[in-house]
C-alpha cells in the first residue's frame, strides 16, 4: 500500500527507493525486464542518504499514455519521462542557482530515436564509455563473488526506472516492452547489444545528474561547516544571510521573490549533518524515508486545463511523435498547478495551511535567531529529517507564529546556528554596523550608549585570535545554564560564565537581571519579555524596538553595576526619545519663604514652625514632580475666574494636611508649582474683582489687597499690577475698553460681566461706535465745566488794579464784557463738540458704508425695493444684531444728509447772526469807553498837543454808504460762485460753515480782550494804553468806528443775511490784499500778543476790510 501511494505521489521519471519488504509485496510485472548484469550494476551503485533523503516534490501531472504495441508507446514514455524530469528539476529549489545543463546524450537518447540526430563522434564516445563500464563491472564480480553474494542478500537499495502510471493495470508487462524494443531495433537495423548499452548509459547519466543537483543545493546554502554536532532540530537549519538592502524586493532576483514554501532554504541539511548521515544504518534510513512519505491524492483544480493523473480517464491516448521543446501557456499553467498541488499535499501532512514566505521573512528569522529572541515554530514541516526529530515530539504546540519573542527553555545554549557565525566576514570591533538594526541613541548627542559593551576586555574574544579555543569553550559550556553568550553582528561571541551579566545587545530589557531570566522557568517572565520587544519592518531592513519602560529598567540596572568613570552631565545626559520628560527642580529657598509668608497672611501661625522644620528636614529629598494638570493642589475656580474665600480656605487646609503627611518616614517632598503660583493668582483675581465691584468699595479692596500681597514673594513685584487702571488680563482690557467713560451706562449688557461669555469683535466695535458720540459729548461737557472753573479762578485771582477814575458806565461795561466772554466760550465749545461729532460721524459712516451688506441695502433703497419706513421698523426690532443696526442706521443717515445739511446751515446762519449782533454791541461799548477816556485825558495834554478834530455827521454817513455798497457787491459775487461750487463738495461746505462760526466768535473776543487790557493797564497813561497820541488819526479812528456801528445797526434790520456777506467780504479781502494793513493798529496788535493767533487774524481781517474802502486815503488821511 505504501508503494502504491508513493507511486501515485511521484511523477514519471522520478527515482524510487525500495526495500526488501516492498519488493516482496510488489507484483512481478511492474518491474522492467532487465538483464542480470544490469541489476548487479544497480546494486553496486548504492544511494547515499544525503542524496536521496529528500525526494523532489512531485512534478505537474502528465497525460496518461495507453500501452500500445507500436513505437509510439516507447516514444511517449520516454518523452513524458524526460519532460517530467525537467519539471522536477525546476521544482527542486527556486532559491538555488540553476544546475548545469545535462549532457546531450541523456537528452536525445531518452527518445529512442535521438541517436539518429547525434553526430557520429558523440555516439561513438557514449558507446565506448558504456562498454568500458560494463567490462569493469564484470571483472569486479568475478574477482569477489562473496561480496556480490552478500550484497544480493542484503539488497540495500534497488533503483529502477518506472514510467509512472495512475493504476497498476495500465503499466505494460515485460513482453510488451520487449516487443517494443525489438520493433525499434527491427526498423533501425540496430543490434540488441547497443540498445541495452544505451539504456544502461541513460540510467547512469540520470543518476549522475540527480547527484549533481543535490550537491549543488546543499553546497550553495551553507558555505562553511559547523564546529560541532547539533543535538537539536533548530541548530541545523541554514539561513541565507542577506544585507539590509538585499531585503528590498527591487534588489532580489526573481526566483527569490517567487511564492515558495518557507522550507525552500530551511529544509536542507548542513554539511556536518550530511557527513553524520552517511554513517547511519541503511535500514533506519529506508524506514525513515518510508515514514516521511506523505499520503497523497490527486487533486484537480477547476481552473486547470489538464486534469491530474489520478482523475483522468485511461481511454484518452495522446500521440505525439516530436519532443516538446517550447512550452505553451497551458503547459505552464499545468506546471504551476502541479506545484500548488504539491504544496497542498505537504500541508495536509501537518494539517496546517502552507504559509507562503519570501526571503525577507527568512532574513528576519536569521536575525532574530542571532538576537536569541526567536521561538521555533513547532510544526512538523519545518523539522529536519533526522532521528533527533522524534526526541522533541512532546513540544509540538502547532503554533505557527513567526516572530515570537521568548526563549526556548529546552535549549541549553543560546546560539542557534554557528555556521552563520563563521560565514560572517571578520569585522573591526565596532558596535552594530548593520543599518537595519538601529541602536538606542540619545537625542542631540552623538555618543553611543556605553551599556552595550562588556565589563572586561577578557570577555570580548576576537575572531582572528582565538577562534578554535573559543569554540571549544562554547562547546564545553553548552550544558550550563549560567553561561551568558552574547552574539554581536560582526560574528563574535562573548562568554561570561558565573559573572555579572551584561546589558542586552539590542536594547532588550532586563526584568530582574540576565541570570534571573536564564534561571527562571516561569511563563510570566517570558510573557513580560515578549511584551517588551517587537519587530518593525522598515524600508532598510528590520528594526527591533524596545519600550521606554524596559529602557528605564536597563538604565537603572546599568547605573547599579557599572564600574566606569562618570562623564560630565552636560556630555551624556539627555532624553533618549521624544517621549521622555525633562524635569526642572529648583526655587528651594523661595518656596520656603513663600509658604511661610502665605501661612502668616492667612492666619496659620501655628503651622508655620512645623512647615519650616519640615522644609529643613526634607530639603534634599526630592521626588519627581507630578503632572501639572493632575495636581491636587490646584484651587477651584468659579465661572468668573474668581477665587472664592471658601476655596482659598480649602486650599490652605489641604496644604496643611499635606505638610502633616510629609512627616511620615520615607516620603519625599515634591515641588509644587501651583503653590508657588498661588499668590500671583490671588493678586490677579483680587484685582479682577476690583474691576467688577462698584466704585465705592474699591478703596477698601485696594487697601486689603496691598496688605495681603506685599510680602508674598520677591517674584511678585515683577508679576504685580502697577495700579487698578492697568489690566492684568486680556479680559480686563476688553472690559475697561468697553466701560471707559461710561461705567454706569445702562445699555451695557450683563453678559459682559462673565468671562466665559465674551462678546465677539464685531459686537465690541459696534458698541464702541454707538457709544462714541455719547463719550465725546460727556467729555466735552466735562472740559467745558473745567474751563469755566479755571476762568473763574483766574478772574478771582486776577490782581485788582487801582480804580483810577472809573465811573458807573465803565463798571457796567466791564461786567457786560465778562458775561459776553463766557457766552462766547460756551458757543465755541459747543461748536467744537459739533465739529468733533461731525468728524467722528463721517469716519463711522464711511467705514460702515464700505461694507457689502450696507451697500446692498443702499442699492435696494435707491431701486425702491425697500422703503425708509421698513428700515425704521427693522431698526425698532429689539432682536436686531448690532451689525445690522449699524448698517440700517448708516443707510438712513446717508439718505438724509441733504436735509441734515440744510438744517445745519440754518442753525449756523442763526448762530452767526447772534454772534455778529453781540460783536456790534461790543464795538459800541468800546466806542463809549474810548470817548470817556479821551475826554478825561484831553485836559491833561492840552499844553502839549492840539485838540483832536471831530468828524462831521456827513463823513460818517458816507462811510456807512460805502460799506453797504461793498456788501451788496460781495453778496452778488457770492451768489454767482455758490452756483458754480454748489455741485461740488457738500461736506467741505459744512466744514467751512463751522470754521466761519469759529472765526466770528473769535473776532469780538479778540477785540474786547485787546481793549480791555488797554483800559485796565492804562489807567490814564497815554503810552501804556498802546495808542500813540497823534491827535487827529486816533480821533478819526474812534469816531469812524462809532459812526460805522450806528449805520450798520440801522442797515442790519433791512438785510437779514448781511452778516454772512460781511464775513465773506472779510475773508476775500484778506486773501486778495493781505499786505494792506493800517499803521494805526500795530500798537493794538502788539499789546494783544497774549491772545490766540486766530483772534489776531480776525482783527486783521476786520481792519483790512476797512482799509479797502474806496477813497479811504483821501477821506481819513
Swiss-Prot record:
Q: What processes in GO biological process is this protein linked to?
A: dorsal/ventral pattern formation; female meiotic nuclear division; follicle cell of egg chamber migration; intracellular mRNA localization; meiotic chromosome segregation; negative regulation of eukaryotic translation initiation factor 4F complex assembly; negative regulation of oskar mRNA translation; negative regulation of translation
**Pfam short name (any one):** EIF4E-T
Q: Name one GO cellular component term.
A: P-body
Q: Which residues carry this modification: Phosphothreonine?
A: 503
Subcellular locations according to the entry = Cytoplasm; Nucleus; Cytoplasm, Cytoplasmic ribonucleoprotein granule
Mutant phenotype after disruption = Mislocalization and precocious expression of orb in the ovary, accumulation of high levels of orb in nurse cells, elongation of orb poly-A tails, hyperphosphorylation of orb and reduced osk mRNA levels. Reduced number of germ cells.
- Where are stretches of biased composition, namely Polar residues? 283-294
Skewed-composition ranges (Pro residues) = 54-64, 95-104
Write down the superkingdom of origin: Eukaryota
Q: Disordered: where is this region? A: 1-106, 270-326, 493-528, 596-618, 654-673, 679-728, 984-1004, 1016-1051
The subunit field of the Swiss-Prot or TrEMBL record says: Component of the osk RNP complex, which is composed of at least exu, yps, aret/bruno, cup, and the mRNA of osk. Interacts with the decapping activators me31B and tral. Component of the nanos RNP complex, which is composed of at least smg, cup, tral, me31B, the CCR4-NOT complex members Rga/NOT2 and Caf1, and the mRNA of nanos (nos). Interacts with btz. Recruited to the 3'-UTR of nos and osk mRNAs by smg and btz, respectively.
Protein name (database record): Protein cup
What species does this protein belong to? Answer: Drosophila melanogaster (Fruit fly)
